[in-house]
């Protein structure tokens, strides 16, 4: 082995770069071509921009599989209903006044 110049970065050492250029082939030989090919092709890691995936939409002719909720009449009193509370207070006052037990 030849002595390596210590001032060179490891990626610039002789023999660190492959003699052939990288290509788009995904065969086993090309996946192990160099470190860059191995990470991109072999491991599937790419740091580029990712495309937006299109959301699958149902065909326009199909209906929603949800039935509308039928309207139901309100049978209970609402918490903000003041007339119902006044009626209840008057009824209670009338009952307490009617007791002659005092």
Curated annotation (Swiss-Prot):
PTM info: Asymmetrical arginine methylation by host PRMT6 seems to diminish the transactivation capacity of Tat and affects the interaction with host CCNT1.
Keywords associated with the record: Acetylation, Activator, AIDS, Apoptosis, Host cytoplasm, Host nucleus, Host-virus interaction, Inhibition of host innate immune response by virus, Inhibition of host interferon signaling pathway by virus, Interferon antiviral system evasion, Isopeptide bond, Metal-binding, Methylation, Modulation of host chromatin by virus, Modulation of host PP1 activity by virus, Phosphoprotein, RNA-binding, Secreted, Transcription, Transcription regulation, Ubl conjugation, Viral immunoevasion, Zinc
Start-end of Basic and acidic residues biased regions: 1-10, 90-102
Motif (Nuclear localization signal, RNA-binding (TAR), and protein transduction): 49-57
Region annotation Transactivation: where it falls in the sequence: 1-48
Any one GO molecular function term: protein serine/threonine phosphatase inhibitor activity
Basic residues bias (residue ranges): 48-60
Family: Belongs to the lentiviruses Tat family.
Domain notes: The cell attachment site mediates the interaction with ITGAV/ITGB3 and ITGA5/ITGB1 integrins, leading to vascular cell migration and invasion. This interaction also provides endothelial cells with the adhesion signal they require to grow in response to mitogens. The Cys-rich region may bind 2 zinc ions. This region is involved in binding to KAT5.
Name of the protein this chain belongs to: Protein Tat
């Amino acid at each position: 082995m030849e002595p390596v110049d210590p001032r060179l970065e490891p990626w610039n050492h002789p023999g660190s770069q492959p003699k052939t250029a990288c290509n788009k082939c995904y065969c086993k030989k090309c996946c192990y071509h160099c470190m860059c090919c191995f990470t991109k092709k072999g491991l599937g890691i790419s740091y580029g921009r990712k495309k937006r995936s299109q959301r699958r939409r149902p065909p326009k002719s199909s209906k929603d599989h949800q039935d509308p909720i039928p309207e139901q009449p309100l049978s209970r009193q609402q918490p903000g209903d003041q007339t119902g509370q006044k009626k209840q207070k008057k009824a209670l006052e009338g009952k307490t006044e009617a007791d002659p037990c005092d």
